[in-house]
Amino acid sequence: MGEIDPSCYRAGAGEPLVLLHGFTGSWPHWRPVLGELAARYEVIAPTLAGHDGGPPYPISAPITLAAGADSLEEHLDELGVGTAHVVGNSMGGALALELAKRGRARSVVAVAPAGGWTDGDGEARRLARFFARQLRLTRLIEPRLTTIMSRPSVRRASLRDIMRHGELVAPADAVDMTLASLRCTIAGRAIATLQADRGLTLGDLDRITCPVLLASPQFDRILPVAKHAPRYRREIPGVEWRMLPGCGHVPMWDDTRLIVGTIDEFVSRHATDSPPTSPPAAALSSARD
């Protein structure tokens, strides 16, 4: 059994594999793939700063990918993680690429990474409107959320923007996933930053020297592949690209076997002989299964 607390899931042994969730999420977004990956790697899935269960986001820090990566590096240092293979989804994908620029990644699997738009192209403002609308709707349905998410057809409809098959998510997980967005303490600031269309585009990609796989969900409604993959495919040195057929923006529930296989094939191909990490004695507390 792994070590779990609200700020991190950690289990397994072998090459260190860091999993980074997206904006307004938390580490349980990776729940479908954790068991299989932890059977092959030392899996470290932190909840990002300012998110539900994660460490506080520094009050004085701007909402930028660079500042988010600063906070993430501090968290990884506290966990005793040096370099690692890094897998990120959405905002987590952008942070994975930012870590690669800093030399912290042995390899990167970026699943529908954010930050691939261009300042002024309207995508940041579109995302601001999307997240603001989602938060308003979530607040409205919060009192009835448990009842709403008890029906598979309603889960599929409610989660359609982030995945194709929301009915595969357990009701309790669907409730937790939805409530996590309301508990994201930086949501308002991040939406304002998106609306201002500054600070959340990822640049200097030529600084990346580790292997990178860009994995694009075929039916991504939040970051459509046609608009959000091209710049990364052009600017990341030696990047590999593949489509994830039949999947939405958060693809771990849509096709768990495909996501595990995609990660495992790429990471195992770029495995190193570096020793595994070891957490500080008091870094994590044991909690629930």
Model regions and ranges:
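Conserved HGGG/HGGXW glycine-rich cap/lid loop of the alpha/beta-hydrolase fold
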Residues: 6-56
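Conserved acidic catalytic loop of the alpha/beta-hydrolase fold
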Residues: 66-84
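Flexible "cap/lid" loop of the alpha/beta hydrolase fold
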Residues: 105-142
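Residue in the alpha/beta-hydrolase core beta-strand immediately N-terminal to the catalytic nucleophile
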Residues: 47, 85, 107-109
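Conserved alpha/beta-hydrolase catalytic His-Asp/Glu region
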Residues: 145-206
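Conserved loop-alpha-helix segment in the C-terminal half of the alpha/beta-hydrolase fold
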Residues: 35, 207-247
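Gly/Ala-rich beta-loop-alpha elbow adjacent to hydrolase catalytic centers
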Residues: 88, 92, 96
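Catalytic active-site module of serine/aspartate enzymes centered on a nucleophile-bearing elbow/loop
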Residues: 236-289
